[in-house]
Amino acid sequence: KAIMHCRGVASWIDIEKTKSDKCYHRIITGTIDAELFSIDGKTGELCQDFGENGRIDLRSGLGDHNPAFYYSVSPPAIIGDLVIVGGGIADNVSTSVPGGVVRAYDIRTGELIWYWDPIPPGQEPIIDDLGNQLYQRGTTNVWSIISTDPELNLVYLPTGNTAADNYGGHRNGSDYYSSSVVALNASTGEVVWHFQTVHHDIWDYDVPSQPTFYDIKKDG
């Protein structure tokens, strides 16, 4: 049984369906035990065509860890037909905690479309003995609310800290994206730009708020 909690939901209308179709209106939500659900907004039933009978295990690819060290704490973000999720990490407990990977799934099928592993540019991903790529452990995480801009096709991530919060002697550049706003291409997950608010953050400042947008006039 999933453990639900009051962290918000995302709502999406499938324009390829009619109002009488199942899952015309989808409610997407994460749980504190790290599952992502797609729910029919009319009936409350799981959308069986999403993931594994309506759910996705967000612990997939994170490696062995204490279940209390990774969980969903914010509503998913939606842009186009993608649902994008980060996750909260117990990043002040140990350096050996799950990574802060951000993943984009097809909102209809639950297929993983892309992922962003917040490792420094040039660092090689981890490959296990079976040739499977694993997400880097202890990296910067995105626990707060993600913003999207359909016009620019960008996803804006407010990042937290690299584990462990208050000591950085071991990091060796792994905090490259910590305490930053990171803009990703919504179609590919590639970094477009990022701005780091605190370099080598050992104070657990994070970027705790959802990025917001406004237009300004330059030079009058």
Identify the meaning behind each predicted range.
Residues 3-35, 68-94, 101, 137-170, ...:
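Repeat-blade elements of multi-bladed beta-propeller folds
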